[in-house]
């Protein structure tokens, strides 16, 4: 799978992801970019799960952002509704972490749109490791959002066999 982590701190929000793509037990590619900017660089998003499924969801999410003039929560709720109710979309296996200057959300195929505590998101196979590391760093250091995301992703990569050390990181200024 993968690890995606998002941290919001001191006027910045970051989403970072590793680059490993696996097929069964085999690493197929080590430099996949699972984090990208959407909607005129005002939204950042990362995915965990099937690559083709995630790219389909990115496209659909960007359309929802366009329909709702970039309103992150409305676009996320609409995507989650479609994902849950459409027979073809329901088969897509991925999780999305998305953020803009105001909010950080997890979007699932079950129709869930979750705004996590402390605006800390960690999804994918290495998610629990990254979340524990990021939480400890948030509570005990003055590191920036970017530094926390990098360190948390590095720790997840040391522990999770489905997470590597090729990182893609996107950052936005944040109001929260």
Curated annotation (Swiss-Prot):
EC number: 3.4.25.2
Regulation of catalytic or functional activity: Allosterically activated by HslU binding.
Gene Ontology terms: cellular component: HslUV protease complex; proteasome core complex
MF (Gene Ontology): metal ion binding; threonine-type endopeptidase activity
Organism domain of life: Bacteria
Catalytic activity: ATP-dependent cleavage of peptide bonds with broad specificity
Enzyme class: hydrolase
CDD domains: protease_HslV
Alphabetized UniProt keyword annotations: Allosteric enzyme, Cytoplasm, Hydrolase, Metal-binding, Protease, Sodium, Threonine protease
Binding site for Na(+): 157, 160, 163
Active site feature: 2
Membership in a protein family: Belongs to the peptidase T1B family. HslV subfamily.
Purpose of the protein: Protease subunit of a proteasome-like degradation complex believed to be a general protein degrading machinery.
This protein's name: ATP-dependent protease subunit HslV
